[in-house]
């Protein structure tokens, strides 16, 4: 029975269950972090299982000989064989003592069948199988092991005289210690209550969550444990120490009873914590961690320091914090007109009609004063303006102080000289029509975009380049086609060699390509230059021809008498040599 703590026969405690109001715990055992309790009274397997669950536990699992020894101790305290339920059941199917392992096909209420122990009252060689639903009780009145608890299969609807519950806890506390040298100790007694409803005074260990009532001091203590620890300690809701005779007043180090109220003391190198009972070493802080802004250490006195604050702050009464100084309330006023305090400083403002210039409030001037707007200046703020234009005009994008004609319609009135009504101007992209009306030029109808999509707007147009251009899908007036190299074309066909065209055979005309307007202008200029050059050459040749003819006539007239004409035969004759 290693690791078993005998808790003795405990006083009855109500389960708080209407269906099992008569069932009361009669004993309890704790092994490490598990506690087991025996409840006496008639109950079916379902009633027993629900009763354990209401107490935050479940029917007992007997996985080792240690758990079997706990059952023996609990049953030995009863004068009759209760045959209590344990947490082993066969919901459906039949058992098999030979092929289904030590549990014969049964499983624990926790949903598994892991075990290193089994003790069946029915021998394994019994041939007739038992079929579920079946549940298991333990009894000491069996033929297989008289006096030793053995497992018996029974229908789950059977009412037994008790059941065993199992509870798991992460930590536990020792019973309260009382200082026997204290004269008051002889009159002090403690009564404990466990979370699963068992109460009494004779315990070896108590699970976390148990409570202790100490009389006649009127103390109510609770077993608690920090998260992640297995060793609990007794505590109460109030801070500070309780009576030093019980559990050292809850103090971690010393309990001082020399004063009217008990007080906990800590070693010199440790500080008392907020609960008034535990001790901890102080956290060493650097000088800068002690002051809100700046800390200056005193080299002459080790451990001493002084705190300082930034500009606009002053040191608080505690000597560590820094408080903001309201500069606006300091005399004289640091601002010429309005002052607004800020954290660590202030801001100056001026009344309406004034602006802050170099720390002074000066009266605002008309923002249009000195402006160079061509038509009219319009203030937009006390310090800014914008230029506006007459109807039919708009500010130039690159020179907003100047105006240019603007028309957002297909036709608008022209800007004519009042002294010369025939002298009129139109916005760019418009043409003067009917003397005083500017009409939009439809560049799209003039083929400005060639084969690309064209969109006309008042005074302008845009081209959307086609898919066969380098800027396909983009808006541009330079939608040049993608150049195609003839030597990179691949011949496609049936695999026969290509046939070269014979001389004189007609060939298809070359595909028409759109020509850019700049190219057309260049061609026109070159053609005109060529015509002018040809005309000049023709004039030169005619002049030269006239001079030569005059010279020839003169020569013919002066040598007419000296010329002897000789008859020349035109027929061919053979000459012999």
From Swiss-Prot:
Glycosylation site positions: 113, 243, 256, 408, 494
One Pfam family here: EGF_Tme5
Paired cysteines (S-S): 135-156, 244-255, 251-264, 266-279, 287-295, 291-307, 309-322, 328-339, 335-348, 350-361, 368-377, 373-387, 389-403, 407-416, 412-424, 426-438, 444-454, 449-463, 465-479
Signal peptide feature range: 1-16
Cytoplasmic side of membrane: 542-577
Region (Disordered): 476-513
Domain C-type lectin: 31-167
Keywords: Blood coagulation, Disulfide bond, EGF-like domain, Glycoprotein, Hemostasis, Membrane, Proteoglycan, Receptor, Repeat, Signal, Transmembrane, Transmembrane helix
An annotated GO cellular component: serine-type endopeptidase complex
One GO MF term attached to the UniProt entry: transmembrane signaling receptor activity
Main location: membrane
Subunit relationships: Interacts with ITGAL, ITGAM and ITGB2. Interacts with thrombin/F2; this interaction switches the specificity of thrombin from a procoagulant to an anticoagulant and antifibrinolytic protease. Interacts with ANGP1 and ANGP2; these interactions significantly inhibit the generation of activated PC and TAFIa/CPB2 by the thrombin/thrombomodulin complex. Interacts with PF4; this interaction enhances generation of activated protein C. Interacts with HMGB1; this interaction inhibits HMGB1 inflammatory activity.
General function of this protein: Endothelial cell receptor that plays a critical role in regulating several physiological processes including hemostasis, coagulation, fibrinolysis, inflammation, and angiogenesis. Acts as a cofactor for thrombin activation of protein C/PROC on the surface of vascular endothelial cells leading to initiation of the activated protein C anticoagulant pathway. Also accelerates the activation of the plasma carboxypeptidase B2/CPB2, which catalyzes removal of C-terminal basic amino acids from its substrates including kinins or anaphylatoxins leading to fibrinolysis inhibition.
Name this protein carries in UniProt: Thrombomodulin
Organism: Mus musculus
């Amino acid at each position: 029975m290693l690791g078993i703590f005998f808790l003795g026969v405990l006083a009855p405690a109500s389960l708080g269950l209407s269906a099992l109001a008569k069932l009361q715990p009669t004993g309890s055992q704790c092994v490490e972090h598990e506690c087991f309790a025996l409840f006496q009274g008639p109950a079916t397997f379902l009633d027993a299982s629900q009763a354990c669950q209401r107490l935050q536990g479940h029917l007992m699992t007997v996985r080792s000989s240690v758990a079997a020894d706990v059952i023996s101790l609990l049953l030995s305290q009863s004068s009759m064989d209760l045959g209590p339920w344990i947490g082993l059941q066969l919901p459906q199917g039949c058992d098999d003592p030979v092929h289904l392992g030590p549990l014969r096909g049964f499983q624990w209420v926790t949903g598994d069948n892991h075990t290193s122990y089994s003790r069946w009252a029915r021998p394994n060689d019994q041939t007739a199988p038992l079929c579920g639903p079946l549940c298991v009780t333990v009894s000491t009145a069996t033929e297989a092991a008289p006096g030793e608890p053995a497992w018996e299969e029974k229908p789950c609807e059977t009412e037994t005289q008790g059941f065993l519950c199992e509870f798991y806890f992460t930590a536990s506390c020792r019973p309260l210690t009382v200082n026997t040298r204290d004269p008051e100790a002889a009159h002090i007694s403690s009564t404990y209550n466990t979370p699963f409803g068992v109460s009494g005074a004779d315990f070896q260990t108590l699970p976390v969550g148990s409570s202790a009532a100490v009389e006649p001091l009127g103390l109510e203590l609770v077993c608690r444990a920090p998260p992640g620890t297995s060793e609990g300690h007794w505590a109460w809701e109030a801070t500070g120490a309780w009576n030093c005779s019980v559990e050292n007043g809850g103090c971690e180090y010393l309990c001082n009873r020399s004063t009217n109220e008990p007080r906990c003391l800590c070693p010199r190198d440790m500080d008392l914590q907020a609960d008034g009972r535990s001790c901890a070493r102080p956290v060493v802080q650097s000088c800068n961690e002690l002051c809100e802004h700046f800390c200056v250490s005193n080299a002459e006195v080790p451990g001493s320091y002084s705190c300082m604050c930034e500009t606009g702050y002053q040191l608080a009464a505690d000597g560590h914090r820094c408080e903001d100084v309201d500069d606006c309330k300091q005399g004289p006023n640091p601002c010429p007109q309005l002052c607004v305090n800020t954290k660590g400083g202030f801001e100056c403002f001026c009344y309406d009609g004034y602006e802050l210039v170099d720390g002074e409030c000066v009266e605002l001037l008309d923002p249009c004063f000195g402006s160079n707007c061509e038509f009219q200046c319009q203030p937009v703020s006390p310090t800014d303006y914008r230029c506006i234009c007459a109807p039919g005009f708009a500010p130039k994008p690159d020179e907003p102080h100047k105006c240019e004609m603007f028309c957002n319609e297909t036709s608008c009135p022209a800007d004519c000289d009042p002294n010369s009504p025939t002298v009129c101007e139109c916005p760019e992209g418009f043409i003067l029509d009917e003397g005083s009306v500017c009409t939009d030029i439809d560049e799209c109808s003039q083929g400005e975009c060639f084969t690309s999509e064209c969109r006309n707007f008042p005074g302008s147009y845009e081209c959307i380049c086609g898919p066969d251009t380098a800027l396909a899908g983009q808006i541009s007036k330079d939608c040049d086609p993608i150049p195609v190299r003839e030597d990179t074309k691949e011949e496609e066909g049936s695999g026969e060699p290509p046939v070269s065209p014979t001389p004189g055979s007609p060939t298809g005309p070359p595909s028409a390509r759109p020509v850019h307007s700049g190219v057309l202008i260049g061609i026109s200029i070159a053609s005109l230059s060529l015509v002018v050059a040809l005309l000049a050459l023709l004039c030169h040749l005619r002049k030269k021809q006239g001079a030569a003819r005059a010279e020839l006539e003169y020569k013919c007239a002066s040598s007419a008498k000296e010329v002897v004409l000789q008859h020349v035969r035109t027929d061919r004759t053979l000459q012999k040599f």
